[in-house]
Amino acid sequence: MVFAAPIVAAFFYKPTKFNNYGDIYQPARPVANLQMQGANGPVELDSLRHQWVFLAVADGVCNADCEGNILKTRQLRFMQNNDMSRIRSVFIHTNLAPDLAADLAAKYTPVEVYAVEADAYKKWTEILEIPDAPTEAQYDRFYIIDPAGNLMMSYPPSADPNLMKKDIKRLLKASQI
């Protein structure tokens, strides 16, 4: 009886609070393929699989929160030290002026900058929505896509990079992909 008690307790225990800082998408959402245009020609989003993807997105304009997220994708990747090679930093946009996109790519190297057609972008970003969140909380977020191509976490623009780093360290340690 004493030996069975922990097993029975674990079966009925349902935690309501987790140790993560970001918003987890449960279940993880498969990310659809997306045709993108990079500086070196067309690229498919599926080609980014098999690595973690830190993602920032913008529709039309890249405001201060957008640029902050691009910077976070780069900085958080660098913060991972030896695990940096397991991560790609990506910025997907639509309707940005080509010279602005090129400036962002140069300013935030090695972040990969890709343009997407407006209709495809609008349909594709439906997956990014967070249920029951206010409208303003839906945009200008920092997203994490796992190596299997699933959207699994996001952070608001005001997120503390040090707390984000802890989440990411845990993810990378647990996945070993």
Task: Indicate where each model-derived feature is located.
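Thiol-/selenol-based redox modules, centered on thioredoxin-like
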Residues: 138-177
